[in-house]
Amino acid sequence: MAFLDNPTIILAHIRQSHVTSDDTGMCEMVLIDHDVDLEKTHPPSVPGDSGSEVQGSSGETQGYIYAQSVDITSSWDFGIRRRSNTAQRLERLRKERQNQIKCKNIQWKERNSKQSAQELKSLFEKKSLKEKPPSSGKQSILSVRLEQCPLQLNNPFNEYSKFDGKGHVGTTATKKIDVYLPLHSSQDRLLPMTVVTMASARVQDLIGLICWQYTSEGREPKLNDNVSAYCLHIAEDDGEVDTDFPPLDSNEPIHKFGFSTLALVEKYSSPGLTSKESLFVRINAAHGFSLIQVDNTKVTMKEILLKAVKRRKGSQKISGPQYRLEKQSEPNIAVDLESTLESQNAWEFCLVRENSSRADGVFEEDSQIDIATVQDMLSSHHYKSFKVSMIHRLRFTTDVQLGISGDKVEIDPVTNQKASTKFWIKQKPISIDCDLLCACDLAEEKSPSHAVFKLTYLSSHDYKHLYFESDAATVSEIVLKVNYILESRASTARADYLAQKQRKLNRRTSFSFQKEKKSGQQ
């Protein structure tokens, strides 16, 4: 047993003892108040009065003044009691009793009295269920749509319906295209079928979407189930297929092309434009002639006249002087435009301006056309590229790609030009419209491996010349192809160039004649 007379040590011991035994915390609060009262009753002593004794006692008790227990701190929740494990267990038992009150216990007892079969039958009496007559109600919209579209479920092109952009207008990038169908009858082919496709679709996907919409609308005749049997061509606003250009590449995205009018054309295995027999009508005009392709002999002469005038004026608006058609063998007799080609019994006509007549000898060209020449002239309008060298003024050359079609001539520099562009000016791309082309002549041919040709065109009211070199076979093919294009197009620039060239030749001839005459007189 220990005897302590220091109240501070005793208070600290009591606090430490109540850490684990006092759950209320009230003793701790009482003891703190007692410390405050103790300080008031024992003020600090005056220095000098038994200073050594006070200093000794204060040195021993300095660490215990207001010493509280280690685990108890003074805060706003100082007097809040933490729940013990016993209280938590009692709370859990209380909740279990409440849940038991909500449950109802029913005791199962065996049935002692036996009931007869009639009593059991009366308990579960069979009900008579009468069959309801079929209701003649209104059909749902879904049933009506399924009856109206019996081919929708059997559409072989359903996989391409996901590229239909009609439900995505305004939310996703789409593209609206008018598609002409040359495989239709003569009446239906005049009206295009509007297709809205996703901008991310490829050309092959667009062909499948066109076939899907064509089949869904129940059009005739039926299409081939293979999408690869069709291709897309550029078409005019009136539905005429532009065969001068190849079909669109099926692997390219459709947003790459800016055409709003296309035509769905069936592919053919044989070379050429189609496997069917091609029919051509020759239209003679001033400074050249044109070959108009027709599908059959049932076409009217009015359609042939419109195509001939459009071919003559090119991209210009069809306005100004009016024209008429005459048979080549019957001058000054206009052809009935409402009649068909079959009733004319002729394949060669002449395009004459109204209120005028054919001059003598203007159209005295040979009417006999070799079929090989016709095929060469038709193929000349198809796009083809050649790799040649362009000759500049200082006689240095630049490798270029020369692309020739029925509408324009494109000159694109080859990208790999490190040697030529290091010291010289880089060649820029050039595009020349065929209406501005004037002539294409062979300049020189030194050997089978080297030849030079000259291309003349109109630029800003002045004639410019471009010189190219390549092997003799390539140069000969290019010159022949360009001349076929020039002969089939009635170009004003070419006519003016030939007239100017003829005037220079006449002036030179007259000058040499006068010079010879003067020398003879002397």
UniProtKB/Swiss-Prot annotation:
Disulfide bonds: none annotated. Residues 279-353 are annotated as: SIN1-type RBD. It is a peripheral membrane protein. The modification N-acetylalanine is found at residue 2. The modification Phosphoserine is found at residues 128, 186, 315, 356, 510. Residues 2-184 are annotated as: Interaction with MAP3K2. Disruption phenotype: Death during early embryonic stages. Keywords: Acetylation, Cell membrane, Cytoplasm, Endoplasmic reticulum, Endosome, Golgi apparatus, Lysosome, Membrane, Mitochondrion, Mitochondrion outer membrane, Nucleus, Phosphoprotein, Stress response. Residues 2-267 are annotated as: Interaction with NBN. Its main location: membrane. GO terms for biological process: cellular response to insulin stimulus; cellular response to nutrient levels; cytoskeleton organization; negative regulation of apoptotic process; negative regulation of Ras protein signal transduction; positive regulation of cell growth; positive regulation of peptidyl-serine phosphorylation; regulation of cellular response to oxidative stress. Changing residue 128 to A: Abolished phosphorylation by PKC, leading to deacreased ability of the mTORC2 complex to phosphorylate SGK1. One of its GO terms (cellular component) is serine/threonine protein kinase complex. Phosphorylation at Ser-128 by PKC promotes relocalization to the perinuclear region, where the mTORC2 complex specifically mediates phosphorylation of SGK1. Phosphorylated at Thr-86 by AKT1 or RPS6KB1 in the presence of growth factors; the effect of this phosphorylation is however unclear. According to two studies, phosphorylation at Thr-86 by AKT1 is part of a positive feedback loop that increases mTORC2 activation. According to another study, phosphorylation at Thr-86 and Thr-398 by RPS6KB1 promotes dissociation from the mTORC2 complex, leading to inhibit mTORC2 signaling. PANTHER family: TARGET OF RAPAMYCIN COMPLEX 2 SUBUNIT MAPKAP1. Belongs to the SIN1 family. Component of the mechanistic target of rapamycin complex 2 (mTORC2), consisting in two heterotretramers composed of MTOR, MLST8, RICTOR and MAPKAP1/SIN1. The mTORC2 core complex associates with PRR5/PROTOR1 and/or PRR5L/PROTOR2. Contrary to mTORC1, mTORC2 does not bind to and is not sensitive to FKBP12-rapamycin. Interacts with MAP3K2. Interacts with ATF2. Interacts with MAPK8. Interacts with GTP-bound HRAS and KRAS; inhibiting their activity. Interacts with IFNAR2. This is Target of rapamycin complex 2 subunit MAPKAP1. It comes from Mus musculus (Mouse). The lineage of its organism: Eukaryota, Metazoa, Chordata, Craniata, Vertebrata.
